[in-house]
Amino acid sequence: MNPDLQLAVEMAEQAGRLTLAYFSRKSLQIFTKRDATPVTDADRKAEELMSSAILSHHPQDGVLGEEFEERPSMNGRRWIIDPIDGTKAFIHGVPLYGVMIALEVDGVVQLGVINFPALGDLYYAERGCGAFLNGSPITVSSVANIAEATVLFTDKEYLLDSVTQHPVDMLRQQAGLVRGWGDCYGHMLVASGRAEVSVDKIMSPWDCAALIPIVTEAGGCCFDYRGVTTISGQGLVSANKAIGTALLASIEKR
């Protein structure tokens, strides 16, 4: 494990332990941000912990986190942090929240780590080195028929009849099984071969930077609604190779 990945794993584990101290706490303080989403002391303290560790080890590296102002990079390296992906789940005592951290070098994400502290699961990947869950290699599933696939959607609109004719939206009517697991947890189900597709319609860089290398190194693919692999796109789709390739072909034909 290279030093950058080792540092990312250590930070994700330390931040995870910090969040567990707040998890299911009845006296948890909850605040509302300008975008009307919730944030807790655990979110802020976990991000501060990771940001401080990065500054200590790599003072010229940049840091982009969900909760605080970006610290610009002076060397082309930028760490991207989501201290608690799934804050609403965290607040309600649902153990599916994740601590996410990625390293981007010259605009390309090189590694990603996602820790699920309440589950005891740690996913990580580095470009060209495969993807792992708790130290064991993982791969996406080989299911190629969408009628046999499990598709996960985050937004409640997918349970309604008024979805668009976009190929990704149409999965709801074609899939063998549709479920509503959101946030990074759903995408890790794809990476580990337990689901075939996971869809998030609204994503920020800190929501997806860590999960993209894990899914792709597990043999899958990630792209937005335009079919582009990016951390700054229009939503995010994670899929196994077979179904992802078919989806991309359908998007290109639109």
Regions found by a protein language model. Name each.
Residues 1-84, 229, 242-243, 249-252:
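N-terminal subdomain of lithium-sensitive/metallo-dependent phosphomonoesterases centered on the IMPase/IPPase/PAP
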Residues 104-108, 118, 127-130, 136, ...:
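Short loop segments at secondary-structure junctions
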Residues 19, 43, 54, 87, ...:
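Residue-level signal for inorganic ion chemistry
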Residues 41-43, 47, 66, 82-85, ...:
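Acidic active-site catalytic centers that drive phospho-/nucleotidyl reactions
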Residues 73-132, 149:
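DPxDG-like acidic metal-binding loop motif
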Residues 28, 61, 129, 175-176, ...:
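A structural micro-motif
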Residues 139-254:
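An extended, acidic
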